[in-house]
Amino acid sequence: MDKYTELVINKIPELGFVNLLSHIYQTVGLCSSIDISKFKTNCNGYVVERFDKSETAGKVSCVPISILMELVERGMLSKPDNSKSQLEVKTDLVNELISKNNGFEDIMTIPTSIPMKYFFKPVLKEKVSKAIDFSVMDIKGDDVSRMGIRYGENDKVVKIKIAPERDAWMTNTSIHQFLIPMCYGTEVIYIGQFNFNFMNRHAIYEKSSVFNKNTEVFKLKDRIRDNRSSRFIMFGFCYLHHWKCAIYDKNRDFICFYDSGGNNPNEFNHYRNFFFYSNSDGLNRNSYLSSLANENADIDILFNFFIDNYGVTAGCINVEVNQLLESECGMFTCLFMAVCCLNPPKGFKGIRKIYTYFKFLADKKVTMLKSILFNVGKMEFTIKEVDGEGMQQYKKMEKWCANTINILANKITSRVEDIIN
């Protein structure tokens, strides 16, 4: 809650102001980022950029011309006219492919060297939850705000019922369909989502034994074994009906956990090689007197599992709360793993940058990203611009940043020139 106190009491627009800080941190190399401009259409721009180096990349269709030429070589499409430009050839091939098949899903069943669906944003089957800017929420961030409006808090607040929206909960399928293409061709492999809710009803001292005997653990071991060639192994897991995730670096014997709900270091067992990342204090170990709470048993068990089975020598987890509402933990973990695909955490410096990215992320921005990173409309094989509510809100936020940057630049330049001159 600390990170929202000043924003809420002073009614600073959280989305614009925090987004501006995020840009500053990214520019000076203090945090990781994800380029939203690569999702302005129905394409996954990162995948297109990774595999399509032609002049037609991201034009006509998300699918590269090289993939379409595979279909020509197999006799599924007509040979192109060599006198035409690449763009004209691609247009002809796309139109022919559409005419010969019964819609988008039919085209996606055609086998190619890289699955064609990887170049498109996956369809969003879930609802986008209702969230608002925290600066207009009635959050009692300190003693003054708890004393009432007349003691300083602006009365411009919006009452919102904080309750889970089950229709907005991310399914394993949606997370899988987004992350598999994001990882494809990188040194990171996503091995799926794991359900550890079977431990929920057991006492803390029983959980480790129950965990090691469950078939879900054998599935985890099998998938790690099947992906020996990848440096980073990444997966999500659910415990007490809350989603978290982890990324394991095989080269450095290092595992990083992420929990959008935040963590209290005093509610974990103490290990000399397990660290807690706080935005204000950095990476630190907890007290020797700390004891494990039930809600953190999954992290404790997984850390020991990786020590015993894979020789992990260090681990870490975030401290700060990133998520206040109760519906989007799946989206938070999905986004964390996506950032890990783009910026794999090679040691503590790398994971610090990823955790810091989430310092500037809250429920409202996540809901915007949910409707931008996924396709909320009908799937089309041709390029379509995204103009939904999420993108409109995101553009509005970025315009606020652009205007504010110009104002700041002018004011700061004026002050500096007064000093220099």
From Swiss-Prot:
Source organism per UniProt: Fowlpox virus (strain NVSL) (FPV)
GO biological process: proteolysis
Keywords, in A-Z order: Hydrolase, Late protein, Protease, Thiol protease, Virion
Active site: 242, 249, 329
Subcellular location: Virion
Protein name (Swiss-Prot/TrEMBL): Core protease I7 homolog
Induction: Expressed in the late phase of the viral replicative cycle.
GO cellular component annotations of the record: virion component
Superkingdom of this protein's organism: Viruses
Lineage: Viruses, Varidnaviria, Bamfordvirae, Nucleocytoviricota, Pokkesviricetes
UniProt family annotation: Belongs to the peptidase C57 family.
Family matches, as InterPro entries: Papain-like_cys_pep_sf (IPR038765), Peptidase_C57 (IPR004970)
EC number from the UniProt entry: 3.4.22.-
Keyword field contains Hydrolase: yes
Function, in words: Late protein responsible for processing most or all of the viral core and membrane proteins known to undergo morphogenesis-associated proteolysis. These proteolytic events are involved in the transformation of immature virions (IV) into mature virions (MV).
Molecular-function GO term, any one: cysteine-type peptidase activity
The protein's enzyme class: hydrolase
Pfam families named among the record's database cross-references: Peptidase_C57
